[in-house]
Each structure stands twice: as structure tokens, then as C-alpha cells.
Amino acid sequence: MASAMASSALREATCTMTRLAADVAASVSSIFSCKDSAGPRPVVPATKTTSTPLDVMFFTWFAKSSGSSLPPLKVVMTGATISIDSTRGALKKLARKGIKGWLNQYMATIKEIEPIVLYEQETDARWASYSILVRVVTSDGRVSYGEAVPTLRILPVVSAVRQTARAFLGRDPHEISAAFYEWYRQDFFLSRSFESATALSAIDMALWDLKARELGAPLYELLGGKLRDRVKVYANGWYGGCRDPQCFAEKAKEVVARGYDALKFDPFGPSFNSITSEELRRAEEAVAAVRDAVGDDVDILIEHHGRFNANAAVEIAKRFEPYRPYFMEEPLHHEDIEGYRKYRSLTSARIAMGERLISAKEALQYLVEGLVDVIQPDACNIGGVTGSMKVAALAEAFSVEVSYHNAYGPVQFALEVQLSAVTPTLYRLESFYDYWPQWKRDLIGDPFRLSQSSVEVPRGPGIGVAVNERVLEKYRAEPSEIPVGEEPVWVVRGTWR
């Protein structure tokens, strides 16, 4: 009985696809202004779909009836190369949009790339008051977003996005790698530009999101499939206003009570380049107070912001050894290679760094020399999804953990959750999420909920969240520079004493 039903369904499917093939052939001929006197070729049973140049189009159709799986069919026709991954869904889509409209989606180009500055004054960090989203619009009206770095560079970054966009406008949005190398040839080859790199990164993010949404799949599926359903995170941004050990300890307890089992903080106040005995004593007291407050089962991570010379960094590492920090982040500026070599030879501390790197080739030097234990690529700097995956692959080859730097905004956060889901050597993802102003969370619908120091990986298409256009328009602002004050823009507000 089941066999008869299957055969009947197969005959019906063959007839349906033959008629569909004729319609598509006519549409393709009109779009490409080409004709084929032979007409559509016959339906041929096949076990898989292959891809060829524009003179051949394949449709793969899996017919299902009464729970029976039928052999896939392949319809070979003149025209362009297109794949349909489901039967009824694809047919319904074709019926709704029309053959020509559906095909136009696959021939769309990048029509517009727009940097959008968002702002609302925030109490705990001046850079957290800003976001720079980059909106990519295709010629058929699809929209996606990436995110760029705002710190101290609002106007230069906005200008760089507009300049970098020239390498992408009019191109096929699917050709992400080709667009990257065109950008490299046009805009980057003769200079090392942070602004250009963050502009590229934001556009790359948006194009990957766009491609995944087009396929109806979460981004992690395009990157090989997820390795974990939940991503472990650590808290940052929680210690605003802390200048004494008691404040750090009390707020650290609140972080753990919220559900985190790892947290990062900068205990160094206004120390810069060198550190006095008194400054080191106060920093040590803060670290000791946090360790005592959270116990031995919580990872504490020490943020240096890359601001010490090698001698000071080594002295700090030795003083902090009794408190067992999981890693020491950016004890020196990333350009101080000799300083990192000295630090490695004189301390046993795990080194975390990488947020300032803008290419996989830069990351490679630290990996080859064994100067990093936890590498921290930032998707907003390193080249978006494309650059992040290159660094993650290198990290796996060198048995180095990955912890994506993740400070700027909700689009970056959602995208790096997807990246973290597929990264083999993941340590944790950085999270300011619970300590951002509410508007940043509302920008993507505030979907992430902490449980056991982790967040669930969204299963929706693309990066798994959608930008709320109403919230975006509410906080849209004219590009302007972040004012420079006594307290540097990169610190958590109120900690520079």
C-alpha cells in the first residue's frame, strides 16, 4: 500500500516539476534574453545536485507523502544555476513571488551601505553610550546589519564605512570573499588602517547574516554546524564607580548571584605605563577582595588594557599569583612584541590578547611564538565572520583557547554567539550584555537570558535576531566625536582615580 502511494506521489511530483521546469525556463530565457530551441530537458532521477555554469539550471526536489521518503528528482534546464532545498516550501514560495521575482533574489546586487550612529548617554562607560551599525540593502529590498567600533573614532569610522562601501556596491552579495579581496586591493593594501578594517568587518558581518537569512538557516549552519547549544560567557562592565576593595567585592558578589561563574575587571585605577608600590598595593587588595568574595570556583580575569611596560607587567603578574587569575588580559600593548617575549619568559601567567588585531596574519605572529594562551579576536576589527573564522582555525592548530572580545553592541554580541557556537577551542565569550543600557538590548528585542553562566544559541535565520527599526530610529544620532576627558574613554566610568 505504502509503495503504491509512493509511486503515485512520485508520478504527481514528476508532472508538477515538469510544468514548473517549463515556467522557469521561460522566465530564465526572458531574464537573460536567451532561447533554447530544444526546450526543457526531461526530468531525470538523481541522487544529488551538482552545480555548473550559467548554461544549466538544477532543481532538486524531495517529495514526501504519507511519511514515505521518495527518491530525489533533478530537473535539468537551460538558464542559471539555482538550488531549491525543499519541495512544498519552495513551490509555495514560487507561487507567491512568481518565478521571475524568485529568480531576481538570486541576481540581486548590493544597492546601499549606510553607517548609522546611535547614542544615548550612559553612566558606566562613555563608549557604551554609542553604537555604529552598518546597514546593507540589496537591490531587491533585503536588509541586514553589521557593527563597527565606536571608541574615540565616530567620524573617521563613519567616513571609512562610506569609502569602503565603494568596493561592495553593485556586487553580488553572495560573493563575500571576492568583495574582500577587491576591498583589499582598493583600500587597504598600502596602509594599515583600523578604521578601514572595522568598516570591512561590519560589512562582512551583514553579508554573512544576509546569506544565512536567504537560506533560512542560522549562521552557525553555514560555518559547519554548532558544537554547543549554549555558549559560556563571562561578565564585564559590572564594576562602574569602584575605587576601593569593598566596592569590587560587593559588586562581584552581585555578579555571581546573577548567575555568572567568571568575571573580568581592571583594578589598576589611573596607573599607566609604570605602577608605583602604592598603586600596586591597592590593585592587589582589590583582586584579593574579589577572590575572597566569589570563592575558588569562579574564574577571575584581570584586565590591563595593554597599558604597562614589561617590567611593571611582570611585577603585577607575580604579585597576583596567589589569587589564581585564569588569565591576564593585554598586560602590554599588542605592538610590544619584545615586551611579550620578556613577560612570557619571566611569568607563569596565562596571556590573553587579540582585540586590537585586524588580520589573521597579525594573530599568527603571537601564535607561532607562543605569546598567547587565550586569543581574543574581535569580529568588529578582525574582518567580521571571515576574519574571525581564520583566527579560530589558527588557534585550534596551535592549541590556543579563543574568547571573542565582545564589548560594543547587540549585533556584535548576537553574531559572536554564533561564532562561539562553532569554535572548537572556545574558552568563553565576553559579555557586557547585562550591564549595557537597556536600549542596546531592546535594539535586538532583548532575547538573551543568562543561565548557568551561559546563553542559548538562537536557532533563527542569520545571526538569530532582528534589529528593531523603531528603536534604531529613536536613538539615531548625528555622527560626532567622543570628547576627550581626564578619564580615558576606554575605562569603565568612575574607576579612574
UniProtKB/Swiss-Prot annotation:
Organism name: Thermoproteus tenax
The UniProt record lists the keyword Lyase: yes
A Pfam family per the record: MR_MLE_C
GO annotation terms (biological process): amino acid catabolic process; carbohydrate metabolic process
Stated family: Belongs to the mandelate racemase/muconate lactonizing enzyme family. GaD subfamily.
InterPro entries (UniProt xref): DgoD-like, Enolase-like_C_sf, Enolase-like_N, Enolase_C-like, Gluconate_dehydratase, Mandel_Rmase/mucon_lact_enz_CS, Mandelate_racemase_C, Mandelate_racemase_N_dom
Cofactor(s) needed by this chain: Mg(2+)
Location of the active site: H305 (proton donor), H405 (proton acceptor)
Binding site for Mg(2+): E303, E329, E355
Protein name, entry field: D-gluconate dehydratase
A GO MF label: gluconate dehydratase activity
Cofactor note text: Binds 1 Mg(2+) ion per subunit.
